[in-house]
Amino acid sequence: MRAAPASALAAALLLLGGCADLGYYWQSASGHLSILRVAKPVPAWLADPAVSAPLKAKLELAQRIRRFAVAELALPDNASYTAYADLHRPAAVWNVVAAPPYSLTLKSWCFPVAGCVGYRGYYDEAAAKAEAEAQRAKGLETAVYPVPAYSTLGWMNWAGGDPLLSTFIGYPEGELARIVFHELAHQVLYVPGDIVFNESYATAVERIGGAMWLQREASEAARSEYARFDGQRQQFRALALETRRALNQVYESAQAKAGDWSAVDAMKKAAMDTFRERYASLRAQWQGPRQGAYDLWVARANNATFGAQGAYDDLVPGFEALFARENRNWPRFYKEVRRIAALPTMEERRNALQTATGLLQTNSSHDDNNNGGHGA
């Protein structure tokens, strides 16, 4: 995913009639099924004279990307991304994340199949905001953010798979390729309850695969457009990583251990002020329509947003190094990732990844925190 699998799987949820939280599971099941109901095979959209030429071009591009994913990245060849759904809304789901005032550790929610993760997804934005408000009332910092895509991990291929969605079909070529590669990567493997491992792995697949697509298949214009887009993203992620580290230092400081919360609040404010000042400097250097792409994220930044972002970044260098170690051979890479994924604990998986790649993973958000969400 480019987003995590933000809803529990519809097929499983329909079996949960005895759960205390039946209302939530029902909205998850009915929300996903509502997407499947409006999805139509891509050829039907292409044959419809009422469909605009730009949308047809994007759908054709998405089919090329899907074929590339299967042929060049050894990703699953199934029903996913062979249909398209126009949702008439800006997001597939809205994720809620929450964290304490002095920690980047996200609150966990537990679901069938997905395990315990640091987010809760809603198909209705108002419901997501209500959940965030409920968590705020408990003293947590919260965030609600739109998710353009999620994966059903291959469980819904019998029902047509995961469709292309209007929420991301208009993305620039390189980004469209990355989101398809990311979501298909989740169908290769998924470790219940370890969102940092899952999202870092899928992000590594999308980055490596996206670079391959751009080099081999994209036009010079598409490569140039993507270079500008990704350059800004990498600068922002680097700044956010430094800020996560700074915040963790604050929350692990002597003042925090002594319970001097006035001092901790002052240090936290200083770290956030520095983040926003440095972002303003970065933004002033950027050009083009995406100059203000992160403005809202920065304005709302808190422990929850920083904690969520860590899931997509923290272990990526290890997976990229593992791919290089396996001679850039996708089947060998997936086999080794499966071996590591089969280890029983998060700590063992992190240690195995470090040993396999010779890298010491240094990150700001304590990988065992089950962080989740859609990275910036």
What role is predicted for each listed range?
Residues 1-8:
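Bacterial N-terminal signal peptides that target proteins for export
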Residues 15-18:
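C-terminal motif of bacterial Sec signal peptides marking the signal peptidase cleavage site
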Residues 20-23:
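Bacterial signal peptide processing site
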Residues 29-69:
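Amphipathic alpha-helical packing elements
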Residues 35, 48, 55-62, 121-128, ...:
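Solvent-exposed, acidic/flexible segments
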Residues 36-53, 109-117, 299-301, 317:
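Acidic/histidine-rich, surface-exposed loop or edge segments in extracytoplasmic proteins
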Residues 65-233, 248:
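Acidic/His-rich structured neighborhood in mature extracellular/periplasmic domains
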Residues 241-365, 372-376:
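Pan-zinc metallopeptidase signature
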